[in-house]
Amino acid sequence: MALRGPAKTVAQTVSVVIFMGALAWASVPLYDWFCRVTGFGGVTGVSDVAPEDILDQTITIRFDGSLNNHMPWEFKPVVREMDVRIGESGLAFYEAYNPTDRPVAGSASYNVTPYQAGGFFNKIQCFCFEEQVLQPGERVQMPVTFYVDPEIVDDRDGKHVHTITLSYTFYEIDLPEEYADAQDIEENSDTSLN
């Protein structure tokens, strides 16, 4: 039985709304995948070790840290910028502090600017690879080990890059189960004492 008149219009409208909702839901993971594959949008590479080829040419790396509106931590780079030789591994630290009276879990997203440098900036180790949990009042320094691929000097756009900015944004996430269970036990014991 074919739909006619207003029923057909309603069915088409509902179909369009469902399709647009599915497209919106899928856009974030699809864009993330696209950026990781192409290096578009300042997404960095990941490597196990720095290359053996270290150039005499240096490049300035700037560090930036920010928080999502709902993240209660304080978060900043320990050093705002450093010069590294291209191909040499660098080590920088970011400091995070949880001023609240509860454990808070966070996950960091990152990007590199200018965007054409993203494909040449490689992380060896990074706090952003894992979720971070800070206890109440805890302050930590979190490392990131990186290098700039020597191929940047041969790239049509990359060879003009003299400064790269590595930016992180921390977002609050749900506590992992082991922390959430421990907090529930602590809260229950506190209420039973009152």
Curated annotation (Swiss-Prot):
Cellular compartment(s): Cell inner membrane
Keyword field contains Membrane: yes
TM annotation in the entry: 13-35
Family label: Belongs to the COX11/CtaG family.
Keyword Membrane assigned: yes
Cellular compartments per GO CC: plasma membrane
Name of the protein: Cytochrome c oxidase assembly protein CtaG
Keywords assigned by UniProt, alphabetized: Cell inner membrane, Cell membrane, Copper, Membrane, Signal-anchor, Transmembrane, Transmembrane helix
Any one GO BP annotation for this protein: respiratory chain complex IV assembly
InterPro entries assigned to the protein according to its UniProt record, in alphabetical order: CtaG/Cox11_dom_sf (IPR023471), Cyt_c_oxidase_assmbl_CtaG (IPR007533)
Residues exposed to the Cytoplasmic side: 1-12
Gene: ctaG
Topology versus the membrane: Single-pass type II membrane protein
Periplasmic side: 36-194
HAMAP family recorded: CtaG
SUPFAM superfamilies, alphabetized: Ctag/Cox11 (SSF110111)
GO MF terms held by the record: copper ion binding
